[in-house]
Amino acid sequence: MFAKVTSLGLSGLAGYVVQVEADLSSGLPDSAVKESSERVRSAVKNLHYPWPSSRITINLAPADVRKTGPVYDLPLLVGLLAAQGVLPVPAPHQAFLGELGLDGTLRPVTGVLPMALAAVTLGVTELFLPAENAAEAAEAAGLTVYPARMASDVVRHLCGEEAITPAAPGGFDEAGTWLGPDMADVRGQAEARRALEIAAAGGHNLLLVGPPGTGKSMLAKRLPGILPPLTYEEALETSAIYSVAGLLPAGSGLLKERPFRSPHHSVSTAAMAGGGSTPRPGEVSLAHNGVLFLDELPEFSRDTLEVLRQPLEDGAVTVSRVHGTARYPCQFMLAAAMNPCKCGYLGHPTRECTCTPSAIEQYRRRISGPLLDRIDLHVEAMPVEYEALAAEAGGESSAAIRARVTAARKVQQERCTDLPGVRCNAQLPGAALRKYCRMTPKAQQILRAAFERLGYSARAYDRILRVARTIADLDGSEQVDTAHISEALQYRALDRKAM
């Protein structure tokens, strides 16, 4: 007696079909039963279905791909019951996912959204899974999702006794009014506010430098409120990563807000880039389409900071481990904050810095030149004057800034329709950069003079052009002129030869 049941697996965010094969043959039962089979055995008995008295052989194909976790409990149960003739053998277009409790309840599993999205392209049209996973799976167009709370619900459906009502797609609406921290709460800091707007409009990386208490963290935490809402495609990508990581809220569909990740400076390289015996997304991937905020940047270990270089450049990270390799997207905005020196008061108008020149240089060298090169905007946040703090009216609201940012992003997306995967100026490749960042002759002269005097790298040159293009977009200008280049140059204050 033999039965084959379709299930799904994941490699990174790529789904693939897993065939769960169950064969019952004459002979004594195998005593070497793994944990998953023990759960299935208990569930079968507690649901009062027969357990085979003969030898059971289970195969999960393809055999050369490592399969872990409890996701195959439900297809194992269905396969064993089908092999005994308790229920019809499911059709190949029907797939099954889910962990079994010992009493036969179905518990949610991770990675359902990317598996459901892949299932449609792999010929699967029906998916049976735990009810808590139904909302995310229903986002896959062309897939009928059957949510169940007990394994017995699935058995009765397959036997034609009691049909399961398919889950309805939740639909996707862009996030409405921002209810988080608002830029209107920020007093003063006009230059930093302007830099945040430019960073949000073009997707640029940002470094805030200033003494303690000047509002660097406060400003960074308001970045999500001025970023444009997630598009449907971005929401799918981001939600898929959170599904794999097990961070998608139970019973919810797609995420609607851009992620904001703020790991502690003690974070390991594996936690930052991704890792584990079975590769899992790290902080850089969890910040995909959102913001990765690193407060007290020099306090992070050198290895942890250096691991950011490749993700910042490529927008993707490959995690290699003994049991497999996974590739995750990580197109994020890096926002970082740091003190100007170890004591924190270099350049403070009223407090004296106690650091020696060599101590200041040593402190700043904790951030390597190549990493600093990849940060587009270097901004000073100085203490706010009393008049600004005491003023009744705050600054401009996040909603007003977001409207300008969204308009600038729309211009960029229309400009880049012929560039797959490019959504903002920060992602413009070299050839497109020269095409779309045409400068006036005077602007070229200013950039050339700065390049020769300060010794910018080729990477810094490209990033200055991208920032200038974003400033021009905010101004509604087709061409990059002297004002745009000059403002972009002022945000490179921490380049090594400019210090």
Feature locations, PLM:
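Peripheral, non-AAA+ core regions of ATP-driven protein-machinery
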Residues: M1-L207, P211, S217, S320, ...
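Basic, amphipathic alpha-helical bundle interface domains used for macromolecular binding and assembly
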Residues: L28-S37, P50-P52, N59-G69, T278-P279, ...
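Catalytic P-loop NTPase motifs of RecA-like helicase/translocase cores
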Residues: D103, L294-S301, G344
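P-loop NTPase nucleotide-binding/switch module
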Residues: C159-I198, G202, P229-V284
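Walker A/P-loop
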Residues: L208-P249, D314
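The Walker A (P-loop) glycine that initiates the GxxxxGKT/S ATP-binding motif of P-loop NTPases
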Residues: G210, G274, E296
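Walker B catalytic acidic pair
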Residues: N289, D295-E296, V307
